[in-house]
């Protein structure tokens, strides 16, 4: 299993070997990230619980491909913007812990402003 640095290096090497960095500005990378996330969503649109379980079982490889595309854009964008994504994740989780204390949010899907 690759670590995050390995994933970033592989994504950057793939991009750079094709001379695509010229097309990778923050706006277009963010758009590509959103588009790939939307492709993940397409797999679940209009399916109820039973349909979804069967669909996931029979389309797991396709869903994995789309999630990997999302990971590609996270890796390249965070690299180019010099954002340590693991550090950003830790910082964000600390903020979320304050916004959603277990004592107020456990078992609820309410937004933090309504707790």
Give the ranges of each region predicted by the language model.
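Flexible "arm" and connector segments at domain edges
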Residues: 1-67, 71-115
């Amino acid at each position: 299993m690759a670590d995050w640095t390995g994933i970033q290096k592989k994504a950057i090497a793939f991009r750079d070997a094709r001379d695509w960095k010229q097309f990778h500005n923050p706006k277009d990378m963010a758009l590509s990230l959103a588009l790939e996330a939307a492709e993940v969503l397409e797999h679940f649109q209009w399916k109820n619980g039973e349909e979804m379980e069967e669909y996931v079982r029979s389309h797991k490889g396709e869903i994995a491909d789309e999630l990997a595309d999302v990971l590609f854009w996270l890796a390249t964008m965070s690299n180019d913007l010099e954002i340590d994504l693991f550090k950003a994740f830790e910082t964000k989780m600390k903020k979320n812990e304050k916004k959603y204390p277990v004592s107020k949010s456990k078992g609820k899907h309410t937004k933090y402003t309504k707790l």
